[in-house]
């Protein structure tokens, strides 16, 4: 929510902000898709859509955790925004969230981690369900401060000691 009110990343739930005409303004890496790979200076990001968000009163769906039940497409406006960014190479703001399983994720909340370019956009098969997903390769723009890095092994050991 703070990223939205601070105008760093407008959507409060969606991981992609932008449109098909100008491209993406920002993305949030928050652990929503198991196919995402975060290497810090570069990462692979999974697109939007393909999730059943209807739910019922007895079994409500969560926007972030609903399972993917259909293929993603580049017709989805958010996926089209990232595809456009791959074409223009206009930098995109990146926010990392604490739920992301990565040494580059903050320990709490969300953090602005700088500008990245979308180097490539393609369709691929999801790792967990065999459905098609939109994939994007991001690369960090040079000349920015180094990313903070967590020691996940030390954090695990400290949690076990408690």
What positions do the PLM features span?
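Compact mixed alphabeta submodule
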Residues: 104-161
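Acidic, glycine-rich low-complexity segments with interspersed aromatic residues
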Residues: 1-111
């Amino acid at each position: 929510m703070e990223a939205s009110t601070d105008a760093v990343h407008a959507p409060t739930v969606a991981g992609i902000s932008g449109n098909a005409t100008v491209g993406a303004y920002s993305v949030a890496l928050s652990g929503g898709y198991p196919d995402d790979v975060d290497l810090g200076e570069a990462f692979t990001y999974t697109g939007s859509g393909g999730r059943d968000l209807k739910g019922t009163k007895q079994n409500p769906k969560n926007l972030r955790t609903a399972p993917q039940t259909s293929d993603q497409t580049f017709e989805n406006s958010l996926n089209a925004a990232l595809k456009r960014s791959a074409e223009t190479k206009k930098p995109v703001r990146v926010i990392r969230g604490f739920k992301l399983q990565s040494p580059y994720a903050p320990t709490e909340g969300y953090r602005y981690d700088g500008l990245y370019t979308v180097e490539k956009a393609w369709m691929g098969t999801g790792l967990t369900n065999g459905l098609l997903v939109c994939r994007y390769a991001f690369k960090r723009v040079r000349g920015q401060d180094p990313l903070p890095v967590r020691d996940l092994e030390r954090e695990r050991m400290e949690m076990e000691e408690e």
